[in-house]
């Protein structure tokens, strides 16, 4: 069975891993880094992903970051006259990770396990699955990030019974999950979180502070200057990381703006204490879901065996201190917070292929599911933290006499009124036979699969008429839309590959021109002048083709020049060999003569021993 790769599709960074020799291994990207920034840039119809895209974000307005925050919504971003959905942008990142995996494994990759925040709702999960399909991947399983982290952590500790809390603070989302590990079973007991809280928010409080300080000093609002804002974002992210290791850092941004007197510079020292003061509210926001998860699990903090930190933002000292204070446990530092989720996804891939045996993963649904009933009340059918996959049915009836149809309004959330919860979808069960209110028996069944994706069906028990819906939220893409995006993604991948080949061809041609100049110089006076002239002529023809940017002509002229240079190089090599041979012969004769001239006659003296 082909390999199933594990992908952590993050808000700020993404990571890909695979099972090798019974161990999950992170696959480095072409630059040799183990994580790839989740950044996509468009420049002259070329798409760039990762570090190269992030580096030019200051000067390129067509750079898209943190798109994961918009998954499952109808958000679109316009780039070069075309609208892109979050699924399409995510698919470009996934294609990049897929290519890294294929280069590493030396084989085509078609299957993946992709992780999502535990608190992602149905629409966000469906959008992630669609992104995988657009990227040319069969998404074998969607799993929750904290659960994946626990899988990677617990793979070697299956014989120990443990209660663990996974605290996952990423770039844009926050999750906390409580799990029990025993005999190879990883059972999620409860989960809670906040999909609008992460490292980006910690960057933002620094940006706001810098903007306020600069405005106070210069009366100029940098938040209105797009290029200045991107420089501030980069500086804030760097300062945040610096303050995990040092107690103060210098932020220096020369020529950030200009006033009447000339250019203005931003110079500021940010202390860890000030950063902790600015971000105290964000740290506190992580503790409420932590308490809720513990309460839902029915555990006291003292019952926990381990606290595992996941996500780059957990390197912030104030975050570590807060979770230590809340649980009374020193956080476990034995996992890499940037890589552990991808490693866990690879383990799940190994479970699905049969490479990893004796592991059973029992996950839960993060939010309650139900329908709207009379008076706008939200009636729950499946409570949050129910182990998935699961199915639940309940019988409802009509609210009016002779009602010909019922509207089924499917919702997800925890609030008592429908209006306060997230709408997943609506559908109708029609052609009900006339009957007084309360008589028709309508059975509504919810199914949640192992990916946490919802299917709902309604059945009139009197007529056996049935209507089903796989939830398509307002952002949900139809099969036709996904198929169109798949084709566009493939076409773009082909175009990107073609562009890469064109660049490589031009580079090779430039290199050959340089090499020809060197060979011609070395051969001056050593070979027939006509041969040198032939090489020079072919080189000039190639240079002319490069200037015209005619690819087929470049290819033909390059091949012709390559042959001439090869022949000249052989001659140069032969001459060097001949010269070396002559020099060796002359040296040998010289050594022989020297030996002859320097012969010393031995002198003997007879010594008579006294006896």
Swiss-Prot record:
Residues 579-592 have a biased composition (Low complexity). Induction: By stress conditions e.g. heat shock. The lineage of its organism: Bacteria, Bacillati, Bacillota, Bacilli, Bacillales. Acts as a chaperone. InterPro entries: ATPase_NBD (IPR043129), Chaperone_DnaK (IPR012725), Heat_shock_70_CS (IPR018181), HSP70_C_sf (IPR029048), HSP70_peptide-bd_sf (IPR029047), Hsp_70_fam (IPR013126). Keywords: ATP-binding, Chaperone, Nucleotide-binding, Phosphoprotein, Stress response. Belongs to the heat shock protein 70 family. GO terms for biological process: chaperone cofactor-dependent protein refolding; protein refolding. PANTHER family: HEAT SHOCK PROTEIN 70KDA. It comes from Bacillus cereus (strain ATCC 14579 / DSM 31 / CCUG 7414 / JCM 2152 / NBRC 15305 / NCIMB 9373 / NCTC 2599 / NRRL B-3711). CDD domains: ASKHA_NBD_HSP70_DnaK-like. Residues 579-598 are annotated as: Disordered. One of its GO terms (molecular function) is protein folding chaperone. The gene is dnaK. The keyword Lipoprotein does not apply. The keyword NADP does not apply. This is Chaperone protein DnaK. The modification Phosphothreonine is found at residue 173.
């Amino acid at each position: 069975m082909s390999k199933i790769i594990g992908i952590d599709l993050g808000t700020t960074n993404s990571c890909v891993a695979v099972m090798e020799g019974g161990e999950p291994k992170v696959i480095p990207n072409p630059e040799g880094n183990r994580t790839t920034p989740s950044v996509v840039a468009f420049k002259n119809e070329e798409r760039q992903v990762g570090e190269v895209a992030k580096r030019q974000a200051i000067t390129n307005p067509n750079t898209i970051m943190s798109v994961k925050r918009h998954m499952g919504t109808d958000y679109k971003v316009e780039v070069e006259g075309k609208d892109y959905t979050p699924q399409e942008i995510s698919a470009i990142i996934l294609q990049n990770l897929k290519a890294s995996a294929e280069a590493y494994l030396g084989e085509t990759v078609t299957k993946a396990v992709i992780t999502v925040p535990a608190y992602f709702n149905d629409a966000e999960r469906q959008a992630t699955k669609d992104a995988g399909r657009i990227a040319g991947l069969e998404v074998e399983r969607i799993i929750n990030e904290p659960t994946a982290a626990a899988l990677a952590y617990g793979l070697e500790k299956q014989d120990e019974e443990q209660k663990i809390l996974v605290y996952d603070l990423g770039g844009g989302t926050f999750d906390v999950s409580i799990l029990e590990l025993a005999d190879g079973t990883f059972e999620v007991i409860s989960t809670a979180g906040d999909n609008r809280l992460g490292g980006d928010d910690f960057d933002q409080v620094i940006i706001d502070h810098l903007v306020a300080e600069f405005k106070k000093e210069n009366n100029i609002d940098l938040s209105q200057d797009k290029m200045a804002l991107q420089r501030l974002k980069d500086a804030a992210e760097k300062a945040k990381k610096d303050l995990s290791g040092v107690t103060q850092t210098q932020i220096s941004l020369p020529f950030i703006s200009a006033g009447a007197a000339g250019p203005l510079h931003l110079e500021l020292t940010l202390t860890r204490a000030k950063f902790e003061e600015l971000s105290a509210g964000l740290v506190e926001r992580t503790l409420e879901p932590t308490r809720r998860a513990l309460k839902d699990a029915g555990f006291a903090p003292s019952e926990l065996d381990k606290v595992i930190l996941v996500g780059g933002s957990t390197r912030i000292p104030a975050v570590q201190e807060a979770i230590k204070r809340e649980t009374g446990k020193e956080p476990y530092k034995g996992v890499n917070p940037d890589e552990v989720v991808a490693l866990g996804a690879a383990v799940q891939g190994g479970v699905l292929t049969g490479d990893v045996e004796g592991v059973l993963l029992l996950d839960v649904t993060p939010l309650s599911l139900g329908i709207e009933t009379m008076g706008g009340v939200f009636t729950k059918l499946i409570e949050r933290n129910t182990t998935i996959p699961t199915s639940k049915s309940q019988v409802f009836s009509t609210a009016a006499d002779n009602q010909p149809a019922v509207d089924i309004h499917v919702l997800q959330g925890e609030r008592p009124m429908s209006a306060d919860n997230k709408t997943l979808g609506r559908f109708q069960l029609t052609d009900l036979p006339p009957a007084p209110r309360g008589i028709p028996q309508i059975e509504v069944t919810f199914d949640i699969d192992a990916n946490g994706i919802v299917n709902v069906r309604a059945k009139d028990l009197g007529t056996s008429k049935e209507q089903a819906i796989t939830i398509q939220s307002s952002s949900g893409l139809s099969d036709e839309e996904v198929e169109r995006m798949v084709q566009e993604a493939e076409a773009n991948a082909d175009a990107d590959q073609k562009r890469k080949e064109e660049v490589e061809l031009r580079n090779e041609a430039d290199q050959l021109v340089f090499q020809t100049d060197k060979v011609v110089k070395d051969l001056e006076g050593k070979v027939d002048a006509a041969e040198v002239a032939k090489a020079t002529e072919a080189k000039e023809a190639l240079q002319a083709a490069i200037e015209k940017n005619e690819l087929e002509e470049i290819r033909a002229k390059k091949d012709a020049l390559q042959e001439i240079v090869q022949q000249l190089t052989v001659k140069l090599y032969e001459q060097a060999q001949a010269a070396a041979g002559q020099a060796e012969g002359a040296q040998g004769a010289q050594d022989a003569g020297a030996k002859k001239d320097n012969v010393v006659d031995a002198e003997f003296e007879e010594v008579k021993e006294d006896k």
